[in-house]
Structure formats: C-alpha cells, structure tokens
C-alpha cells in the first residue's frame, strides 16, 4: 500500500487524499476540499469562472470542484505548471521533471524549419513593437542561438502559442487554457490554435491577467486531478471547448 505525504497533514493513499484531524485520518470530501487543500496551495477558481462553468450543468455542485495551483512565479510559471502536471504520470520519462527539463525538451526537438518560422514571427512582432521578451530576435542567427535563449529561463523567455504547439507535439498532451482577465472582464477559453487530440492526456491552465499561469485541477473521488484523460476531462470543460466525447 503506497502512501505519499503532500504535507505533514495531507497524504495520498490508494489514489485518495486523506487529512489528519483529531488523531485520525479522514478522506477529503467535496464539501471541504478547498479548505483542506489550501494547506498545499490549492484555491478555488474565481467566482466568474465558477459561474460560467456551473452554467454548463443542470445541477452544479454546491461547492465548486475546480481548483487552481500556483506552481511558481519566477517567469517560468508556464513551464512549472506543465512539469508539475507531468510528474503525475506513471512514466519514468516524466518523473521529477522541472521547468528546465521542459525547456530542454523544446531545444532538443525543435527543427530548423520550426526555428525559421518562430524567429520570423518574433521579428515581425519586434517590428510592430509587440515583442514582449527582453531579448532581440534580430540578434538570433541560428537555431542554437534561439535554443540558448529558451534555456536561460526566468523572464527571458515566457513562452507563447508557438511554444505551446511544440510542447503538445513533443509531450503528446493537449493544453487547454482558461483566460482569467479581471482588468478587462474576460473569462473565456483561450484560443491556442492547437487541434485537440483525444488520445493525448490533457493539462488545463489558468491564464491570469495576461501575465501568470496556474495549474487547474478538478476534485473527484477524494482526489485532486490535474492531468486528465479524454474520459476524465470535466463535463463543463468538454462543453465550453466543444470537445466531442
């Protein structure tokens, strides 16, 4: 019987989350998941997103089961979220991944053709003063130069939809993004331009105010799920993304 401690008070046993209370261990339930799992960083989605998702159901849960986790805010938030989700796979390739591993995977798999497409696009953004990275795409003269920038990490290379396309093909995962723009009151699925693949696992991210990514999870069967199969993607997400199932 495998037992994994998340904190001193929370553990996973037989794919179920338990917490320590009054000298005993109790399963975490639908009504209290947000209170208990707050200890390890999980919080509810914003009320706007909860309302939007609840509208997809005839009888939504009284306590929303969607949560989000801040996996890091040092400029590598996108890569932190993806690595955290992948570490949940029972696959030796992805165990103990971190953000640098994700960046390295990109540099190992990017082709010359992809490099040329990416750098041309970045230069167009630079010309229109819409390039948000701290480096100059005109200083990049080879694929190796671009890979060096990608590997620097932090705020030097945040990641974008081109990088997401690469990650999906490299990792064989779908990446769905929920926009949470409180400044402009936008709460919609983010158009990643990537085709959904039902044979892939799926990672769901929350994109907050155009500057920060968080990992989205769903509490089900006494466990917080944040890496989904085609069958386990929450119905509300299936509806708003029009996924055929």
Would you name each region that the model predicts?
Residues 6, 20-21, 31-35, 43, ...:
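Compositionally biased, intrinsically disordered low-complexity regions enriched in proline and serine
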Residues 35-188:
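Papain-like cysteine protease catalytic cores
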